Amino acid sequence: MLGPVPLSRRELLGALGAASGSTLLWALGCGGPVRPPSTPARVSGEVRTWLRDAVARLAAAFPAVHVLAVSRQRTTAAVDVLGAGVARARRDGVVLAVRERSGRWREQVTSELTQAGIAAAVRALAGASPRRASLELGEPPPLPPEPAALDDRALRERCEQITRLDGKLSSRIVYAAALVDVDDAHVWSISPAHDREQRLVRVRKQALRAAWNGTRPVVTEAERGWTGGVDDLDLPREAVEQATEDALLLMTPGAFEDKERVVVLDPPLAASLVDAGARALLTSAAARRPEVRRRLEAPPPLPAILAIADDPTAPGAYGGFQFDDEGVPAAPIALVEGGRIAGALADRAAGGSGGRGRRPGHVGAVEPAPSHLRVAPGAAPHAALRDEGLLLEGAIGAAVDPGTGRAVIGAARARELKGGEPTGRVYADVELAGDLFALLGQVSGVARETVALPYRDEAGGEPRWRSVEAPHLRTRGFVRARRRRA
């Protein structure tokens, strides 16, 4: 008889399909080597001097100039069933953008946040000319507050606090982990017309649970994210214990009937639908596609109870900011209001005021993207939205095809409802499918309680941050067993 085969964290998380596995592997020391920063930490004053000099030299050669610089540190602490770990890494970058007299924009990017590195990037754009334009930028803005420093021991203790919250752990939980992830970005934005600076400390706390339901792994999580101090907010005990209960939930065997149904989406699923829809259709980049432009020119009517905005000024929002990566001050943008599409997310390429030009890691290619999407709450408690149909829970991905508008939203489970109460039947791995505007157009209930969800993914190896605040939504759509990709 074969004995037990030891699994590494990488193999275990891979077998379970844990979505946050790469972050945990990195924090627990199982990932690849962390590249050391190419430059030491810099104080704000000397960085500003170098950047202003770069703007002055570029402004003497080009009609429009913008320089964006970032010094970013990521710290991740994790505790799992096998041990604990803390990982730290730092990334610097400077993006110099200029508009030529022909109207074409050019960029030069460097990872050297040093006087010599910035000067070399300027020469790559403007040559060796010593000419400098006169700048009237006035006094620099006040320094942003310095976040409290936490050593490895303190960070591990924060993770262990999350673990101690759970009074419902059992031997059926085959994997449990707690995570504290901090992205600290110090950002400067300077042009001939403005000088701005911000410190964005984005914090995520997460509890991850995994269990086997027959031969099928079930992975659940509780997560909270914000901008501010590590101890400003905590994961609620009830959220951590709910993640454990959901992982242990026994599913109803047998086939699931695919058909159109009334569904209630829990906040993570509602957030997933709104996030995927806004990024696929409600940006200036999407509107440049002819098929998207045609859909937006004559969209179907939407219910008056549904209002969606993107608001980076929301206090403590994980995806919030004071200015975007093109230097435009933060302001809310209404996307859905009064039963119609009311606006879109735009960057500099779209003309107008822009305001949502965002770069992955503050150094990647600029793109129009959401910051903190908010679905306005309704008047009724979420329990009042339940009637006949299904309660869909646990977001496991959403996709919207910009060309056709077709949306597919994956859910970890579907609870059958009769007379507003669960019947006890729970089906695993389903998905809601249909036209995005049809799914939004059939929203017939919006709950008053909202939940804010943080999103951190990567593009080209650089992080993208955003968040969505959403309540339960009741709508109607086609529900089927989830179709896994090969």
Where are these regions (language model features)?
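Active-site bordering "gate/hinge" segments
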Residues: 2-321, 328, 337-340, 419, ...
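Dual-mode signal for accessory low-complexity, basic/Gly-rich regions
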Residues: 296-486
